[in-house]
């Protein structure tokens, strides 16, 4: 059973933070050492789709949405290393899927997109 959090307050800034985080992630995808331009473009598209989906998450789930954005950032940052650490990639990928799972009830597409991001990063880094 998933944890439930009751949150109140002004979450308008959270959407901006999510968009900013994922815009930075999109811009850094070019730094992943890979010759697979198709996978690189696919990852950029998936991050864009994730950003759009997370901006539609209800206010009471913004904390979970922010966790998804931050975990996607960690995954891409890990993949950018000259020799990406396969264990860290696996942990970051699982973390992204788990963070997305927390939103599956309100935004199921986030879980699908997160899984596709993990697979695409694995293709780019040769860890598949």
Task: Annotate each language-model stretch with its function.
Residues 110, 114-117:
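Mature extracytoplasmic or organellar-lumen-exposed domains after removal of signal/transit peptides
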């Amino acid at each position: 059973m998933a944890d439930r959090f009751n949150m109140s307050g002004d979450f308008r800034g959270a959407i901006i933070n999510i968009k900013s985080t994922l815009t930075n992630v999109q811009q850094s995808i070019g730094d992943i050492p890979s010759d697979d331009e198709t996978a690189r473009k696919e990852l950029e598209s998936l991050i864009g789709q994730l950003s759009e989906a997370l901006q539609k998450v209800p206010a009471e789930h913004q904390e979970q949405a922010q966790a998804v954005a931050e975990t996607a950032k960690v995954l891409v940052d890990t993949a950018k290393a000259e020799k990406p650490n396969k264990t860290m990639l696996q942990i970051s990928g699982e973390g992204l899927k788990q963070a997305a799972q927390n939103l599956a009830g309100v935004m199921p597409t986030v879980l699908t997109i997160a899984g596709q991001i993990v697979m695409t990063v694995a293709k780019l880094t040769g860890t598949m």
